[in-house]
Amino acid sequence: MYLHKLQQDEIFVSNEMKSLKSITGMPSRKGLENAIISNGKIVNVVSSSYGHIPNELFFKKAEQLLIDAHLKYHKRTINRDDRSFITDFIIEDDHQFSLKNEEGKILTMLRFKNSYDGREKTSGHFGFYREVCTNGLHVSNAQIDFSIKHTKNNTELILPKLNGLFERFLDNQYYEITQKLGKWKK
């Protein structure tokens, strides 16, 4: 199956938040107190209220939820210049569908995003992975389930939001959507 050809970028790159003063030896203005360093490069300059969320914490927790639920999945990881990261968990089960004369298989997908440069909020959503051709090209259709700004107070909200998305996925949304896809197939 085409899933063995999924992109596998390294997403667990070294990262830290350091004060600009410790890097430059000069004081910085209010609102630009810290630098986010990813894989040896400064990718963002942030205020002291910024909440840095390491990929190891976020993506490993998401994967552990799938493991604990005994779901079979394929993982695709995307690293955009050591500043923005995506992990897709493509669920392999009996609820896969084919469209257009058995071409274009559709599988359930959970997508999680995190960025160190501030361009994207940490988010997770439920969607679909569709094989368009055998080289693994895909399109996805999804709804954002949670999206959280990087502030110190909000970092405590991420793991409960992640758990909530996963519980709704297992409870009913996944099965309601697979029933709708089954109707489209007919």
Model-derived features: positions:
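Feature for intrinsically disordered/low-complexity regulatory segments and propeptides
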Residues: 1-61, 70
